[in-house]
Amino acid sequence: AGFVSGDAVAAGEWWRIMSSAFLHVNLLHILFNMWALYLFGPLLEQLYGRIEYLAIYLLCAAGGSVLTILAQPEQQAVGASGAIFGLLGLAFAVSRRRHLALPRQTRMVLGQIGSLLFINLAFTFFVPGISVTGHLGGLAVGLVLGWLLPPSPAFTLAGQWQVAGGAVIAGMPMLMRVAVYLGVAGLLVAGTAVAMLNIA
């Protein structure tokens, strides 16, 4: 009973914003999400490092929950799909914004993300029983993080990327990276507060 809904969160059960991402309706539901995570999760973990990857995953999961309680507070939603869509958004954004800075093989893998994202969005809108807000909330957070955050300095020598023509792109200082994560988290907290005011 760890689903997220506006009424439950308004009753003080804030933990549902995160717990819902670790529960699934049935075996097929969890298998599909884990398969999607298996496809591109390891590559994103390599790009951002284990700690940042975990932070991104949790923020995307929270993004799906927060948009759900904002837009459809009566909905009861569970599943990791918001986080999965967030990772898709992250991969799409970083592959577009940092295209030349990524290794060739990484570019090839991430180049397929656009098609995968389009297919999953089609399922989101046309298959009954799917939390549209959960998917879109996670996607929005992932797109923002992917656009603002270059891959972690741990991914390349001295936090730099060698690109075509020999140019070098410096990595983002850790303090700025932390500020981005805290800023997104703050927006999610603010969104939750607005949702609670609307329900009250």
Question: Can you say where each PLM-predicted feature lies in the sequence?
Answer:
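C-terminal transmembrane module of polytopic alpha-helical membrane proteins
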Residues: 121-200
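A cytosolic-side transmembrane-helix exit/cap motif
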Residues: 75-76, 98-107, 153-165
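Membrane-interfacial alpha-helical segments at the cytosolic side of multi-pass membrane proteins
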Residues: 31-52, 58, 86-99, 140-153
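Multi-pass alpha-helical transmembrane bundles in non-GPCR membrane proteins
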Residues: 91-124
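N-terminal TM1-TM2 helical hairpin plus the immediately adjacent luminal interfacial "cap"
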Residues: 1-80, 125-133, 137
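Residue-level signature of the transmembrane alpha-helical core
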Residues: 18, 58-62, 83, 88, ...
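Residue-level signature of transmembrane alpha-helical entry/exit and packing/kink sites
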Residues: 16-17, 53, 108-116, 177-181
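Helix-boundary and loop/linker segments of multi-pass membrane transporters
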Residues: 6-12, 105-110, 170-173
